[in-house]
UniProtKB/Swiss-Prot annotation:
Lineage: Bacteria, Pseudomonadati, Pseudomonadota, Alphaproteobacteria, Rickettsiales
Keywords: FAD, Flavoprotein, NADP, Oxidoreductase
GO molecular function: ferredoxin-NADP+ reductase activity; flavin adenine dinucleotide binding; NADP binding
Known partners and oligomeric status: Homodimer.
Organism of derivation: Wolbachia pipientis subsp. Culex pipiens (strain wPip)
Matching InterPro entries: FAD/NAD-bd_sf (IPR036188), FAD/NAD-binding_dom (IPR023753), Fd--NADP_Rdtase_type_2 (IPR022890), Ferredoxin-NADP_redctase_2 (IPR050097)
UniProt name for this protein: Ferredoxin--NADP reductase
Pfam annotation, one family: Pyr_redox_2
Catalysis performed (reactions): 2 reduced [2Fe-2S]-[ferredoxin] + NADP(+) + H(+) = 2 oxidized [2Fe-2S]-[ferredoxin] + NADPH
Superkingdom, natural source: Bacteria
């Protein structure tokens, strides 16, 4: 298989890059280790609202991915899902051969790494027998809010994810207990005010300073969560249908470490003007890329996508783009 650009990562920035490249008449293949496009937006936060997309006062992560996929579809990008890029070889001059873990090979003229935070998995709390309950009554993400309708939920964690999901799920849940080691939550003041309001209304209870201690139930169905007070060591049993631990994600760059690209603190160093890495014709955009004063916003990732694509076009064709606004150019299928 041959193409112009291989995009590594099928999150929102990677999908938009397929569209942006298509607008410049460049063909793309997109490779992602997950079994569906969307990255963390689909895998972890599908029903979480996003508020900073221009033109959308609010849009769920899943809906954003669907819209981006539709936007890119006229250019017919080829998706290789459930595959991990193992090797980037350019033994044949300027062109690359991309090789995945299942032996897929794609020849291309340039590579764009849009791998977000790299390979990730949720941090699992050290509770005996927790594996029995996972994906049955213990979940590390929320795929369908309706699954929690009229249920009693224990949410563990004190960061943005725990606080945000408490606010969202309080709209459908019977009761939510929020377990945190400290009285202070690491969330925005606005969200903290919402938590206090929900507690005053009896929709949630902030169980602090406590930590998870034990699970009670059987056959994968949770009956209760036992928590322990940090100071007094007093134990408390909370009847619950679900446990949602939000203790962050463990990130791993995986094979990226072996691609001969200059890294800094787990991120790929790029030229902020072009998004080019330390290897010619290999670019990095979105959260995986770093440069001075970078803003880790989805909007910035979209802009980086355009900058990288325009520079790739110039390199491939040895001439600058004949710039046209999308209103003039329109959309033409490959």
């Amino acid at each position: 298989m041959e193409t112009d650009i291989v995009i590594i990562g099928a999150g929102p920035i990677g999908i938009f890059t397929a569209f942006q490249a298509g607008m410049l008449d460049m063909r793309c293949h997109v490779i992602d280790v997950l079994d569906q496009a969307g990255g963390q937006c689909t895998a972890l936060y599908s029903e979480k609202p996003i508020y900073d997309i221009p033109g959308y006062p609010v849009i769920t992560a899943q809906k954003l991915i669907e819209q981006l996929m539709e936007q890119a579809s006229p250019f017919e990008p080829v998706y290789h899902l459930s595959q991990k890029v193992e090797k980037i070889s350019n033994n044949e001059g300027e062109n690359f051969t991309i090789i995945t873990n299942i032996g897929t090979e794609v020849k291309c003229k340039a590579v764009i790494i849009a791998a977000g935070n790299g390979m990730f998995e949720p941090n699992r709390p050290p509770l005996s027998g927790i594996l029995e309950y996972e994906n049955k009554s213990v979940f590390y993400s929320v795929n369908k809010i309706s699954d929690f309708q009229d249920k009693t939920i224990v949410i563990a964690g004190g960061g943005d994810s725990a606080a945000d999901w408490t606010v969202e799920l309080s709209k459908v849940a019977k009761k939510i207990y929020v377990i945190h080691r400290r009285k202070e939550f690491r969330c925005t003041p606005e969200t903290r005010n919402k938590l206090e309001s929900l507690e005053n209304d009896g929709k949630i209870e902030l169980v602090v300073p406590y930590q998870l201690h034990e699970l009670a139930g059987g056959n994968g169905q949770l009956r209760a969560v036992i928590v322990k007070n940090i100071a007094s060591k007093e134990e408390r049993e909370i009847s619950a249908d679900f446990l949602l631990p939000f203790f962050g994600l463990s990130m791993n760059l995986g094979p990226i470490n072996n691609w001969g690209i200059e890294l800094e603190h787990g991120r790929i160093i790029v030229d902020p003007a072009t998004l080019r890495t330390s290897r010619d014709r290999i670019y990095a955009i979105g959260d995986i890329a770093t440069y001075p004063d970078k803003l880790k916003l989805i909007l910035n990732g979209f802009a980086e996508s355009a900058m990288a694509c325009y520079h790739i076009y110039k390199v491939i064709h040895n001439s600058p783009v004949n710039f046209q606004y999308s209103t003039s150019k329109g959309i033409h299928r490959n």
